[in-house]
Amino acid sequence: METKFFVVDRIDGDYAWLKRTDKEAEPVYIARALLPEGADEGTKLKQEFLDYEVV
């Protein structure tokens, strides 16, 4: 599976908008429960195998 890099662009209640930083793509709308604890707007993330970690 492809490794992807994101930044948390916006928090919207129980969901977050993620913006790809490694290539041009549409924003991703994802449940905050899937993100690492403490992830907030501006947090940089790496996604591998549907698992997110702060970078």
Regions found by a protein language model. Name each.
Residues 25-37:
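Beta-strand/loop nucleic-acid-binding surfaces
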Residues 12-13, 49:
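Residue-level signal for tight coil/turn positions that link beta-strands
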Residues 49-55:
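Short, Lys/Arg- and Gly-enriched loop/turn segments at beta-strand edges
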Residues 14-18:
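Short aromatic-glycine-enriched beta-strand elements
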